[in-house]
């Protein structure tokens, strides 16, 4: 199967800049963590999701923005500064028409009380240390979420995968989070008024590596089944595979599980040309439904993105649809993906809210034969 690619026009949505000692932190809405389409919607209507919000490495905050009072944090492993944790995760409705993508509306995620979800982490001993601009630790809060994938359901509601818990959020069409699925034993930590918290996720999901939680998600068109996967294999497990689970959307009951095999790290050519890559580097970032137990899988490191058509019953076989090593105009950090038509796939990059001045990229991948049916 051969592929043609086209970058679609898009103008990032600018947020208010933050004045810092030596430079302004310019921010844009980072809506590229996940994409989804609802069967029956108008052609080109898609839904995107942001993650937890902008964050800075400690060295970046000190060296690039003059936040020298953070010097005492420099030696804390994996520490991050979150300048605006209150931005929080949200859904963004978009329209693809011709060769452009346009903004329709933002749907903030919130509790049934109206309180916004935000970017701080829930309680747990396996969370990265997070600090505000003053250098104070962000307090754990069950209202925190780091959403990384989205599946829109036939009734207009949403499932969202987030990697802090990890957990699955169930939100209504207006963004009110009415339920949260977690691994057994995590119910107390995630409990919130007005939100049903159920310990139904596979226990293995709770063994995720830091920042490598639930990253890929899609639903069957009838809304009966969810497919979800960890970005990388669980901590201590074989780094050459990562689990894929199939869940009943009504009960959360496990209906299937598979081990998805990663390509050899050296085969991600654009990444291997920049640095030494190893077994823990490849990751799965998105699923798109292509038939019963058939998925398009977005597999990448950073600069090389590969799309595979995968019949789960025939793993480890997988069929390459496109590699960005053959289309070097495609930028890094492709995270979101959905199927626009039987022969068209839409990709979007995560621009990290414009930190580092990255732009969001939308790409249409056109195939010479249909994926569906």
Where are these regions (language model features)?
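Sequence/structural signature of beta-propeller domains
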Residues: 1-373
